Amino acid sequence: MGFRKFSPFLALSILVLYQAGSLQAAPFRSALESSPDPATLSKEDARLLLAALVQDYVQMKASELKQEQETQGSSSAAQKRACNTATCVTHRLAGLLSRSGGMVKSNFVPTNVGSKAFGRRRRDLQA
């Protein structure tokens, strides 16, 4: 009973092995025979081959750099959005005044603007 299940598998495997033995793969060296051996290249041919390889590499890197700059330009435009609301303008003006220094700072009265401004009160200015 087990031999009947095993018999088709055995026949199929024998057929596959017979077909694999009768087929011959193409020789691997035949494809390489057409290209010249690097050891037999003249110095001029080797120099031209090296120049072509370097030129292709430089062109490939230049195209990659150009593509990278294009993708960075589009993504940075999406990341930096102009904020023209009153809160953003006020914060930008407060930052400008705090960075300006010198004479403006001596006459500058602190306002209730900035990251630490909310809920902060100064008692010395309320007099």
Swiss-Prot record:
Entry GO MF terms: calcitonin receptor binding; hormone activity; neuropeptide hormone activity
GO biological process: adenylate cyclase-activating G protein-coupled receptor signaling pathway; calcitonin gene-related peptide receptor signaling pathway; intracellular calcium ion homeostasis; regulation of cytosolic calcium ion concentration; signal transduction
Propeptide: 26-79, 124-127
Main location: secreted
Residues the record lists as Phenylalanine amide modifications: 118
Keyword Transmembrane recorded: no
Cellular location(s): Secreted
Residues of the signal peptide: 1-25
Entry keyword annotation includes Disulfide bond: yes
Tissue expression summary: Expressed in spinal cord, pituitary and thalamus.
Intrachain S-S bonds: 83-88
Keywords in alphabetical order: Amidation, Cleavage on pair of basic residues, Disulfide bond, Hormone, Secreted, Signal
A cellular-component GO term for this protein: extracellular region
InterPro entries for the chain: Calcitonin-like, Calcitonin/adrenomedullin, Calcitonin_CS, Calcitonin_gene-rel_peptide, Calcitonin_peptide-like
Lineage: superkingdom: Eukaryota
Protein family per UniProt: Belongs to the calcitonin family.
Function per UniProt: CALCB/CGRP2 is a peptide hormone that induces vasodilation mediated by the CALCRL-RAMP1 receptor complex. Dilates a variety of vessels including the coronary, cerebral and systemic vasculature. Its abundance in the CNS also points toward a neurotransmitter or neuromodulator role.
Protein name, entry field: Calcitonin gene-related peptide 2
Taxonomic lineage from the root: Eukaryota, Metazoa, Chordata, Craniata, Vertebrata
Name of the gene this protein is made from: CALCB
